[in-house]
């Protein structure tokens, strides 16, 4: 299970970087301001989440994992809202198919990335709880 989640994380990161690099390297149009703003929001939230997870493991304060998991379910919902926002943008304004493909692809992979990280955390939380039960 752990290996599968790590592989999912790796594949999501690889897809996001590869698709973005190809888009830029092929001189496609830049993303719209709203799209860039949305991606920056996600980037900031993802950075905060990963820093919090890193701090948990550095301090070995594993009781905080449950809190992170609960908070980050809201993060997945936020990404879903951003996807819906883009659907509404497409309906009201003209958009480049290449930009839309890149944007949706990155959003969906980010959502998969978050879910894989959360699944890995949940698995570790379960392991930690079982370990505590055995030591009691």
Residue ranges and their predicted role:
Residues 1-136:
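Cytosolic, long alpha-helical scaffolding segments
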């Amino acid at each position: 299970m752990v290996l599968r989640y790590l592989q999912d994380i790796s594949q999501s990161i690889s897809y996001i970087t590869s698709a973005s690099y190809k888009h830029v390297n092929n001189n496609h149009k830049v993303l719209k301001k709203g799209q860039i703003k949305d991606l920056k929001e996600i980037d900031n939230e993802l950075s905060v989440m990963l820093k919090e997870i890193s701090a948990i493991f550095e301090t070995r304060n594993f009781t905080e994992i449950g809190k992170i998991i609960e908070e980050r379910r809201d993060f997945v919902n936020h990404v879903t809202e951003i996807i819906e926002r883009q659907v509404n943008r497409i309906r009201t304004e003209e958009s480049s198919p290449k930009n839309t493909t890149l944007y949706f692809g990155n959003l969906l992979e980010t959502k998969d990335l978050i879910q894989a990280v959360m699944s890995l955390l949940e698995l570790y939380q379960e392991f930690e709880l079982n370990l505590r039960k055995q030591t009691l």
